Amino acid sequence: MPIPRTIIEQIKRIIPPLDGSLHKGQSGRVGVLGGALDYTGAPFFAAFSALRFGVDLSHVICAPTAAGAIKSYSPDLIVHPILNESSSVDKVKSELQSLLSRLHVLVVGPGLGREPYMQSYARLAISLVRERGMYLVLDADALFLVGHDLSIIKGYRRAVLTPNVVEFKRLSEQVGVDPDAPPDERAGVVSRMLGGVTVLQKGAKDIISVDTTGEEADLSASHIEGADAEKEKIKETIAVDVEGGLKRCGGQGDVLSGCVGTFMAWGKCYESGVYGDGTVPTSRVPLLAAVAGSMVTRTTSRRAYAKSGRSLITQDLLSEAGPAFEECFGGDKGRL
């Protein structure tokens, strides 16, 4: 099923121009919170793929036990080893506040793990993001955190959740979705019950849904100003069945998180008037970012699989990110 033309046109509007008018940082600054002793690849893939998809700066906020490995993977990443188990909450909070002031979006979850201290820091970061009205992507063990306390994310319409099959089943049960509900409608139900967050349900085809008709959807708590509350009550589902690769390997979901984060960072730059015509509403950005991220990541996977076949690993996707972006959106009117 083709993506509606209006969606594609809106996505292209939030992509920064490559015309020499912007300085460093105005094409997106992404942060990834995750990375502990056992998990160093996931935050790298999320943060580095954001660079490959076109952001200017990419930061990793991690535990000290992960920092050395992540730094060694690429000199292009800015690594902050502040999630120290022995640090005081006040110290970490102060450091997070300083870092968040420099970012357009925070991706929480890749390599986060389930250690209590990492989960606690993720909860803290999410609360600070909400206070600042930043865009937010939640994946992997950040979804585990949400499942244990739905209030962490409920009503925050600047967020995108990216569950895989297992994570979506668990999340559906936790919010109370009827197990007999049609499969293609469940993501919309989860969105409504979580107050209008955008849900990107990964699968053979990706289902992106947003439903802001429930009572929990909150424009003011989402820092969406000047919008008509009635017009903002929407139900929308987009199925993305762009061809992807046939090999599944650990890390591809992290690439998706980085790509969605890229488009959300651009959405923030667009919202702030750094470039663009201002015709795309702020409330559209999470849906557009999820659709665009799905399209580009699936295309990246297809291109990498065509070269590597059964031997494909996630690193193979990174060199295909730029060409995949061009294939999906590239070239016209001075844009990426």
Swiss-Prot record:
It comes from the Eukaryota. One of its GO terms (molecular function) is ATP-dependent NAD(P)H-hydrate dehydratase activity. It catalyses: (6S)-NADHX + ATP = ADP + phosphate + NADH + H(+); (6S)-NADPHX + ATP = ADP + phosphate + NADPH + H(+). This is ATP-dependent (S)-NAD(P)H-hydrate dehydratase. GO terms for cellular component: cytoplasm. It comes from Coprinopsis cinerea (strain Okayama-7 / 130 / ATCC MYA-4618 / FGSC 9003) (Inky cap fungus). It is an enzyme of class 4 (lyase). It is found in: Cytoplasm. Catalyzes the dehydration of the S-form of NAD(P)HX at the expense of ATP, which is converted to ADP. Together with NAD(P)HX epimerase, which catalyzes the epimerization of the S- and R-forms, the enzyme allows the repair of both epimers of NAD(P)HX, a damaged form of NAD(P)H that is a result of enzymatic or heat-dependent hydration. Its EC number is 4.2.1.93. (6S)-NADPHX binds at G111, N164, V165, V166, E167, F168, K169, R170, D254. Its cofactor is Mg(2+). Its main location: cytoplasm. GO terms for biological process: metabolite repair; nicotinamide nucleotide metabolic process. Belongs to the NnrD/CARKD family. Residues 7-328 form the YjeF C-terminal domain. Keywords: ATP-binding, Cytoplasm, Lyase, NAD, NADP, Nucleotide-binding, Phosphoprotein. The keyword Cytoplasm applies. ATP binds at residues 202-206, 244-253. HAMAP family: NADHX_dehydratase (MF_01965). SUPFAM superfamilies: Ribokinase-like.
